[in-house]
């Protein structure tokens, strides 16, 4: 079957997340030191990170809203530091703006730019991400015809809604109905990307090679739950394990540069 479109995860698939995120968080905290000393004199970056993670995990309002969680965290600590409601809100918006600009300063893996340039000649390309990076603000953004994020759809991988939305986008852009199996999704997280894509009847290629990626799920072995993905669809540990054991990627690659060969094998 001819592959008509390819969708990509972003973080830890096209670029490493950790260096960008650490830099953005550190620089945002430095900004707060200058602009909200009363806050940073009392609370550390670690304090804020722990609060943010707990808020994301426990408060259903922020289930798919990473950006809002960051704003709410800064606002909460500003209020604890005796800033007024108005001042706390302004600080949260300004600090998040600093963070968000830095969040887009990604360094793609070797070969990604050339890969996307070549693939875009014959395939429609899009992105499906649970993160809040705006791929259109990155150096590779021009290669993609659409970009979906969990917070804009209010649905996270592996939930079928975000994949169904991708299918609708692709059909609209191509002006034709597609079988979902004519779309390939590429990602590093087995539960979010591979389980999600296969349940939506997409083809799925698992990028299982970067040393920074979560070592949580092997092809038939569930080692550690992925909290973000499981939360997004209310998946229990047992169901997550069952899905990971039953679903197999259509291809597995160790580096993003190996993708063309994997795509060729799926087309033959």
Please place each PLM-identified region on the residue numbering.
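N-terminal helical cap/lid subdomain that shapes the substrate entry/recognition surface
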Residues: 2-110
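Asp-based, Mg2+/Mn2+-dependent phosphohydrolase catalytic module
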Residues: 1-6, 18, 34, 41, ...
